[in-house]
Regions:
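Predominantly the structural core of cysteine protease catalytic domains
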Residues: 1-77, 84-120
Length: 120
């Protein structure tokens, strides 16, 4: 994909979250993610170290930007399935906009529909 294609994909993910809520994504887990040594004190994961271990799925619930060493880093806000004892009450941040750990390549969204009592 070109950078333009990738930027359009990021915008599509953001639009989907705004319109219908969280999306599910798969991403690559490396040693320093699995043992938590790659996370900053704010629960941010921006650098891989070690071997690729496996793929994992989380929900992307939002996005933002934070300052790290006077550098503005865009991130996805992710909700893990490990429960509230993981990271920041079950949430963590992953670098946004660079397809970090392939997080922006493997995204799914459900199509919402309404069920009415008269349909039951």
């Amino acid at each position: 994909k070109t950078e333009k294609d990738h930027n359009e994909n990021v915008r599509a993910i953001q639009k989907e979250i705004l319109k219908n809520g969280p999306v599910t994504c798969g991403y690559q887990v490396f040693d320093n993610h699995y043992d938590d040594s790659g996370f900053s004190s704010t629960g941010s994961y921006y650098d891989t170290k070690g071997d690729y271990l496996f793929s994992h799925a989380v929900s992307i619930i939002g996005w933002g930007t934070e300052q790290v060493n006077n550098i503005s880093i865009p991130y996805w806000l992710c909700r893990n399935s490990f429960g509230s004892s993981y990271m920041n009450a079950g949430y963590f941040k992953m670098k946004r906009g660079s397809n970090f750990c392939l997080i922006e390549s493997d995204v799914w969204a459900a199509e919402p529909f309404a069920v009415y009592e008269s349909d039951l």
